[in-house]
Amino acid sequence: MAVEGLKKTLVLGHRNPDTDSICSAICYAGFKHQLTGENYEPCRAGNVNPETQYVLDYFNLKAPRLVENVKTQVKDIEIRKTKGVSRGISLKNAWGLMQENNVVTLPCVTEEGLLEGVITIGDITKSYMNLYDSSIISKACTKYANILDTLEGSMVVGDSEAYFNQGKVLIAAANPDLMEFYIEPHDLVILGNRYESQLCAIEMEAGCIIVCEGAGVSLTIRKLAQERGCAVITTPYDTYTTARLINQSMPISYFMTKENIIEFSEEDYLDDIREIMASKRHRDFPVLDSDGKYIGMI
């Protein structure tokens, strides 16, 4: 009667069941399944007495499963199937997924489905408030592919799968004479189409230059950047927009909560977790299956 894998409705009689109670549960579950095609399982709320066991044996039937309580478990309520994301996706993409799916929390999972962390809309908002750490993008170990995606840019020189993991981010607003005093090795420099500024940044051993407003990059600059190991990216955005957007390229792994995550098993009873949920300020909690793998949010 019960079809494996489908959600079940349990059919029970009274406690300390007699033969009528158990036979009624078996018959009614079978009747409802035949009538609706849905999943009904006969159960019992106590031990089988000898008389009932004799009847079951006579008709070659197994005793219904014992159900010791009918408390609501996590698996009995709606679990929102918020898809897990990789730790390497950018803040921009995480924000987009939140808006698209109308959620405020995203779970970060491994390829095996294990929960690594969670990131909330509040975490993303806080990341925008860290205005004074010009090296935060390298501290976050940001992939160039994320920068390209965020800035809608093109990789002119370098490997998009490499990481920007050293140096600070700065805008080359001054002339080359002054740039020499504040550009340091491995820095990421946002600049315009001035040949002299691009040349100066590369000679000062910048790790990457971002050329704004869709400006072309000369063959000489490309060749020198290649020789010096300097990545070159072009973007259609102006320097102001580029500077505002680039922080959104950082991976969520740098900002997500990794420790002391409040998570529940699908076998947990709601009565046991209700108080825990009410005591926390956030609204979404990950749910794990019996193998410890992420299955959704409540």
Q: Model-flagged regions — what are they?
A:
Residues 123-164, 229-230, 234-236:
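Juxtadomain coupling helices with adjacent low-complexity linkers
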Residues 41, 64-66, 106-107, 189-191, ...:
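Short hydrophobic alpha-helical runs that function as membrane-insertion/retention elements
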Residues 134, 222, 227-257:
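Long, charge-dense
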Residues 101-103, 279-282:
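Short, small/polar residue-rich loop motifs at catalytic or cofactor-binding pockets
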Residues 67-97, 109, 144-157, 163-195, ...:
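Bateman/CBS regulatory modules and CBS-like beta-alpha motifs in cytosolic regions of diverse proteins
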Residues 114-130, 237, 282, 286, ...:
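Short beta->alpha transition motifs characteristic of CBS
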Residues 15, 45-48, 68-71, 111, ...:
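Short, ordered loop/turn segments at secondary-structure junctions
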